[in-house]
Amino acid sequence: KMNETAVSGISVSGAHEGNLQIPEGIKKTVCPDGLPERFKDVAGGMGSDMDMLVKESSAGAVLLSADSDVSGEPARIRFAYGAFEHSLNTFGILAKEGSNMTVIMDMAAERSVDPERTGSPSPVGENPAAVSQSEHTGLSAVQTKLILEKDAKVTLVQIIRNKNAKTVLNDIGAKVADGAKLSVIHLFLGGDRVYNGCKAELIGKKSNFTADIAYTVADDCVLDMNYVALHEGKK
């Protein structure tokens, strides 16, 4: 449940097979059992129900970490979702003290049934171009948890344009330490029912969080957004 909206009957079949382009200076770690213990108390904007969904999915996680300024070359994560796919992906972003990194996530609908395309295969005989949006039953869920250590900077860009999804769940949770800065940029361009929750805990002195949001919502579609900045540190 988020805001006054309750989403029920959610189930996932595993993680979506995205295309990750990770530049030098950012370390990628696959975590089959989920994110490391230090991420457990990072609360997301969609609440504990999303954490439970992640736990029940047993889909594992991917951790991206940096310990220097690598902002000149972003990490890019591209998704190409099918019309009947039910998937969940979990990402952790660890920006160590003094580091600077940018992560771009492009969550799109698949364009063809080319076997060389990025993403999970479609059911046999499915041609996404021939499937009307009213027939789509797909669900795409992404949870991203971030830890920014002292004086770290992270820019997280998420482009949500998955017209193949009946339901889109996007969850962000962050802990921001002394002098650290988190910038979230959101572009919402597609999806039948899109639910987005973002929570940043500013636990350090002069910690900072900004969110820049742009969106288009078609007739009869839903975009439910929730952004929380919890300031616990000193000014």
What are these regions (language model features)?
Residues 1-62, 69:
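Long, low-complexity, mixed-charge
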Residues 42-116, 129, 134-235:
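Conserved beta-strand/loop scaffold segments within soluble protein domains that form the structured core
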